[in-house]
């Protein structure tokens, strides 16, 4: 029998993932949304729009009857299950906003629940609330009116206090009316394990924002504290498992792993620093002193509200019930440790480019902790490696041309430390880059056509030299920068300073003077602005300088320029910085600058495909 579910918070960070997973069940979902048209567009862009399962009902959590039209209200009252995962994720909201969203919201949702239970019986109420809520199965049977100001819960922060009181209220109502309630307490939620894509940047993102600015010189709490994390796909799987219980009973489920399985704050910040390519803090400072410093003006400097430290904990939590439901190994197999660097790089990317949207023609995956964008298609994939002063998304137009002309899949890589990929600390820069090639090769057992532009071409040359490629693989090099016309030694600090402080006009002048582009009209729209924004990220700035240092090194120039090879090379003859690498193989000329794959993707694809068997 099809189960009807009222889902509140279905357009949020947790909710969208939940919809995706519930959609595989025999269900009909009433999705409470503020705007039906915006919600439909959101789910279409996410690829989660299941029109036969989803019914969008316009309303408002903060209004009586959830602000629903009478017809929608009657439909909603046919629900068998209510899942409440709604409310803002903003620790700085006012007391009035917090009361409206959480306490009033809890009241109006509970009224709907009571109406359903009296009429037909509510099978299950599922509420998602943060793991720091002080209420559980043992202490929530207390006769307190949560709407009276006298009960302050000894928590000064409006966000936390009202959220936790809402938790208590919904437990009270469930017991009073007689329906089972499952309260699910997740820790800080990050993106799914397949990608690490974390659109909710106000959680872990507060630490990322501070560290990327060099404003996290200490370790709050030291090794005794931790910031528990859970992936939203793991959380959604757990909610679905609870949803499918045959005879649900009222329980609290705390989704916090055992201490020995979790990262302490020192370890978390070390991984964060490494992923962002910055120096890690080592000196610990007590939480109370840290709060005092933040309350004394430190919050304005670091961007970290003092109350956000409440998400750090030195407590142990009972997760026995979770293990009973999911199995004893669940916390280990779903640990965010497995892909945390990708989460951090994703948050950093979102802070760097707050309005950047991913082209829906590409699906994003993680392969060996680097981000790879993939199209659909049949046959051997084209695998593209970008150069410096660019990332994988800059090669999307070329990738689309290759896909449309051949029908074959296209994979575009964000190199470590650039785009959405975390920096990877290795003994040498090339170790991480070659490891990326190795991971990709393991995914394409029948071979692939590798295409490297600029620095990406150097990666493929190095992999070829070390015999990574197989007979079924082929390679095209676009503008391999192996022979500089003029070599100038500039210290790394000067390079870093020059990039970080360069104006839009100076960057454009540099692009034309070096022949990245032949004329200003060939520079893609928003390219210069994107490059300038990129250097607000320490990860991208430091990685760019390090990779540039490596590509300019004497040893690598000798490796790339001396031996006679037989690569297919396409060369833009308006490049003013590099000479044609005639030793590397047959060269086809195009009348464009160094960045011709960005400025002329159609022409580039045409020349690449001249020698490709389709």
Question: What do these predicted regions represent?
Answer:
Residues 81-84, 93, 104-158:
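Conserved Rossmann-fold NAD(P)-dependent oxidoreductase catalytic core, especially the SDR/UDP-sugar
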Residues 417-451:
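Active-site loop/oxyanion-hole signature of alpha/beta-hydrolase fold enzymes
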Residues 47-105:
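NAD(P)H-binding glycine-rich loop region in Rossmannoid oxidoreductase-like domains
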Residues 154-182:
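Active-site Tyr-X1-5-Lys
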Residues 241-305, 347-356:
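Mid/C-terminal beta-alpha module of Rossmann-like enzyme folds, strongest
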Residues 316-366, 611:
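Amphipathic terminal alpha-helices
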């Amino acid at each position: 029998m099809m189960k009807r579910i009222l889902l509140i918070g279905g357009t949020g960070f947790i909710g969208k993932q939940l919809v995706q997973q519930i959609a595989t069940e025999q269900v009909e979902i009433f999705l409470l949304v503020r705007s039906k048209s915006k919600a439909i567009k959101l789910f279409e862009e996410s690829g989660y729009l299941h029109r036969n399962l989803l019914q969008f009902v316009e309303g408002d959590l903060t209004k009586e009857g959830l602000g629903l039209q009478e017809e929608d209200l009657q439909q909603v009252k046919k629900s068998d299950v209510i899942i409440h995962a709604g409310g803002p994720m903003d620790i700085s909201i006012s007391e009035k906003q917090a009361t409206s969203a959480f306490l009033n919201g809890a009241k109006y949702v509970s009224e709907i629940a009571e109406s359903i239970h009296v009429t037909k019986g509510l099978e299950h109420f599922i509420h998602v609330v943060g793991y720091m809520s002080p209420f559980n199965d043992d202490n929530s049977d207390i006769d307190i009116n949560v709407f009276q100001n006298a009960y302050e819960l000894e928590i000064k922060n409006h966000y936390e206090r009202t959220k936790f009181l809402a938790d208590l209220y919904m437990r009270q109502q469930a017991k009073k009316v007689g329906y089972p309630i499952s309260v699910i307490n997740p820790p800080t939620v990050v993106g799914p394990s397949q990608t690490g894509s974390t659109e909710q940047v106000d959680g872990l993102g507060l630490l990322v924002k501070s560290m990327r600015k060099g404003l996290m010189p200490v370790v709050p709490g030291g090794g005794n504290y931790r910031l528990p994390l859970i992936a939203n796909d793991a959380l959604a799987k757990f909610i679905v498992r609870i949803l499918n219980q045959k005879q649900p009973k009222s329980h609290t489920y705390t989704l916090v792993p055992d201490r020995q399985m979790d990262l302490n704050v020192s370890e978390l910040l070390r991984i964060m620093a490494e992923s962002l390519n910055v120096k890690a803090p080592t000196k610990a400072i007590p939480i109370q002193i840290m709060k005092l410093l933040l309350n004394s003006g430190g919050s304005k400097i670091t961007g970290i509200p003092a109350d956000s430290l409440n998400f750090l904990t030195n407590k142990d939590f009972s997760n026995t019930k979770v293990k009973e439901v999911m199995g004893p190994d669940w916390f280990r197999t779903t640990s965010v440790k497995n892909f945390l660097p990708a989460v951090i790089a994703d948050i950093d990317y979102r802070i760097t480019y707050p309005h950047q949207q991913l082209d829906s023609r590409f699906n994003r995956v993680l392969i060996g902790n680097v981000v790879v964008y993939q199209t659909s298609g049949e046959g051997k994939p084209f695998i593209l490696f970008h150069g410096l002063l660019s990332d994988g998304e800059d090669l999307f137009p070329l990738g689309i041309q290759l896909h449309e002309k051949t029908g074959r899949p296209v994979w575009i890589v964000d190199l470590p430390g650039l785009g959405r990929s975390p920096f990877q600390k290795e003994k040498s820069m090339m170790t991480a880059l070659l490891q990326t090639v190795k991971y990709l090769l393991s995914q394409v057992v029948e071979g692939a056509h590798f295409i490297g532009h600029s620095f990406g071409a150097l990666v493929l040359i190095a992999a070829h030299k070390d015999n990574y490629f197989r007979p079924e693989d082929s390679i095209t090099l676009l503008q391999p920068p192996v022979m500089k016309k003029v070599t100038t030694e500039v210290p790394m600090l000067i390079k870093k300073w020059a990039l970080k402080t360069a104006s839009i006009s100076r960057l454009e002048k540099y692009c034309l003077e070096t022949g990245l582009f032949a004329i200003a009209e060939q520079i893609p729209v928003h390219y210069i602005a994107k490059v300038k924004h990129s250097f607000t990220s320490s990860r991208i700035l430091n990685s760019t300088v390090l990779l540039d240092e490596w590509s300019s090194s004497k040893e690598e120039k000798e490796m790339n320029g001396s031996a006679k090879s037989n690569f297919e090379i396409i060369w833009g003859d308006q490049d003013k910085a590099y000479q044609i690498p005639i030793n590397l193989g047959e060269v086809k000329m195009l009348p464009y600058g160094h960045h011709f794959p960005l400025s002329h993707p159609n022409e580039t694809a045409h020349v690449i495909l001249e020698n490709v068997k389709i």
